[in-house]
A protein has these predicted regions:
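Cyclophilin-like peptidyl-prolyl cis-trans isomerases
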Residues: 1-112
Length: 112
């Protein structure tokens, strides 16, 4: 998987305001499964701690269903996600990429 949305670029950042975790183990029905291409909210161990960080599932990870708030799907460009994951050179066990090598989302489009 690939994770983004951290303003600090080190996996620790986020907005001051957080949102309720919208997944079944937190009392909210969410039928979106964590299959390849799913976009979901990242969070800490607190189920209501999501803010700006998100992740894109590169390969089916249905073990996350019910515990993370999936909210969308990549409609095109999974080849780019695959290439980023392939080229990544993590600096630690958490998959952190050096700041000068982190990919940047330059544009995004939401589709209904």
């Amino acid at each position: 998987m690939i994770q983004g949305g951290d303003p600090n670029g080190d996996g620790t950042g986020g907005a001051e305001d957080t949102i309720k975790g919208e997944f079944s183990s937190n009392g909210v029905k969410n039928d979106i499964s964590h299959v390849r291409g799913t976009i979901s909210m990242a969070r800490s161990t607190d189920p209501d701690s999501a803010s700006s960080q998100f992740f894109i599932v590169q390969s089916d990870s249905t073990h996350l269903d019910g515990d993370y708030a999936a909210f969308g799907h990549v409609t095109s460009g999974m080849d780019i996600v695959d290439q980023i994951c392939k080229d990544a050179k993590p600096t630690d066990g958490n998959g952190t990429i050096a700041k000068d090598q982190q990919p940047v989302i330059e544009s995004i489009r939401m589709v209904d």
